[in-house]
Amino acid sequence: MHYDISFPHLGITLDHVGKSVDLFGVSIAYYGIIIGMAILIGFAIATSEAKRTRQNPEDYLDMGIIGVIAGIAGARIYYVIFSWDMYKDDLLDIFNLREGGLAIYGGVIAAVISIFVLAKVKHLSPFQIFDTIAMALLNGQMLGRWGNFFNREAFGEYTDRLFAMRLPVDAVRSGDITEKMREHMERINGVSYIQVHPTFLYESLWCAVLLIILVLYRKHKKYEGELFLLYLFGYGLGRVWIEGLRTDQLLLPGIGIPVSQLLAGALVIGTGIALLYLGRHHKNSPMHRSVTKYEPMPEKIKGKKPPKWNERLFKNMK
């Protein structure tokens, strides 16, 4: 197998991009490493935002653990349901995450449901929580897509545009290669290559832009839940376009419609209507009242400046 990946029109060539790294004799997939990094950074973002908005960050550690477990399970279940032909003959392969196979929509849906239930149990505002985790979710999606890069998956149809990505045929699943890719296949130094849209890169950059927008807008939000609605609207808008470029779409059985593209379209319409309505009527909504009623910051979160060295010294001398 050949491990090089290149972006010919950008003059970028990476000669050896493996799918895993060996540490102390154990092979660890880059996909898993990236997901782990995304989770840790997401925790940091959510707890930092919780402190900024006078919430208890410990609540987010509890919800984060439940949300991550539910999210990974939901992402896998969603993927398996719409790719059942790949797993029906070997059910144990369902539990093999080393080769990827996580659907972002399934993960977000499962995580949001679990966090909503936990918020109700803890008597917290779910809308405030969703705003707090919106940037953490975007970070996870932005970084997580690079797992697709290492796995040579989630790419689009043939293209010869500026960001075209060139992959060795023997490093790609045969089922992901379309007729159009075969027609434009190149042979370089005895190796066959396909050239495709790097849709993982498009989505990662799209999420990065959305993340910057939310960071800049967060201090100007009008009601709890607005940041989360903007996240859903913006992500859905990008996904409608990007999903149309992909060749490994998860299809609705018997219909052949890309399920993620359908969900993205519904998400854009639904959140768009909600944003327009709440933009006018948020003052009469419980979501508005919760934005002005933060719980007092716990004493250990407020923090107290430690006494200076001379204050400690004189105190001990008294």
Enumerate the language-model features and the residues they cover.
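A feature for loop-to-transmembrane-helix boundaries and adjacent hydrophobic helices
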Residues: M1-K318
